């Protein structure tokens, strides 16, 4: 295939910022990418009680998908695409952006389920940081389709040298 398209995730929280780290939608697209095929994780931001703007999706994705397929010239690319929940006349265009970030999540909470068991729920996600202007959070909220090329390498290169230095004695002592 020329392209793997991972499910259209439709919900009030899309795959932006840190969400890509634990998203099943992005995980599915990553599998295609690891098989050597350009892949896209699609998400549509929905507002509770509103119908999905499928005309907007059709308009936004028509040219975008064709261009994404053409970009797989040298090597595959892993894409994250978030569509805003706006009517076609309010769609502002497409922007290639970096991932934004959120403030800390709210604290987990405890409840008792219908079977009398104690369950622990993660608290709601934190709000996007206001300082993130040209990111997926900001521009998607303004009515843009946001497109982010992703990588599977989650190595923190800024801390790699410090970690090697701090753990050098352990590395030297370790016998394999």
Range-by-range predicted roles:
Residues 1-5, 10:
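Single conserved hydrophobic/aromatic residue that forms the stacking wall/gate
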Residues 40-67:
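Short, glycine-/small-residue-rich phosphate/pyrophosphate-handling segment
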Residues 14-23:
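Glycine/threonine-rich flexible loop motifs
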Residues 27-38:
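Alpha-helix C-terminal capping segments
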Residues 71-74, 84-176:
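C-terminal accessory domains and tails appended to enzymatic cores
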Residues 40-42, 79-81, 145:
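Hydrophobic/aromatic beta-strand patches that form the interior of the parallel beta-sheet core
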Residues 63-66, 70-74, 78:
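A glycine-rich helix N-cap at a beta->alpha junction
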């Amino acid at each position: 295939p020329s392209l793997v398209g991972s499910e259209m995730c439709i919900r009030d929280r899309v795959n932006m910022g840190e969400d890509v780290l634990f998203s099943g939608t992005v995980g599915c697209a990553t599998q295609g990418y690891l098989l050597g095929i350009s892949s896209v994780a699609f998400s549509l931001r929905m507002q509770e009680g509103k119908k999905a703007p499928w005309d907007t999706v059709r308009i936004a994705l028509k040219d975008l998908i064709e261009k994404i397929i053409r970009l797989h010239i040298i090597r595959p690319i892993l894409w994250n695409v978030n569509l805003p929940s706006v009517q076609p006349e309010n769609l502002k265009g497409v922007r290639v952006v970096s991932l934004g970030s959120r403030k800390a999540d709210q604290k987990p909470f405890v409840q008792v389920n219908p079977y009398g068991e104690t369950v622990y729920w993660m608290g709601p996600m934190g709000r996007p940081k206001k300082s993130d202007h040209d990111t997926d959070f900001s521009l998607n909220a303004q009515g843009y389709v946001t497109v982010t090329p992703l990588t599977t390498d989650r190595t923190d290169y800024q801390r790699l040298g410090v970690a090697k230095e701090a753990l050098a004695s352990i590395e030297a002592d370790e016998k394999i």
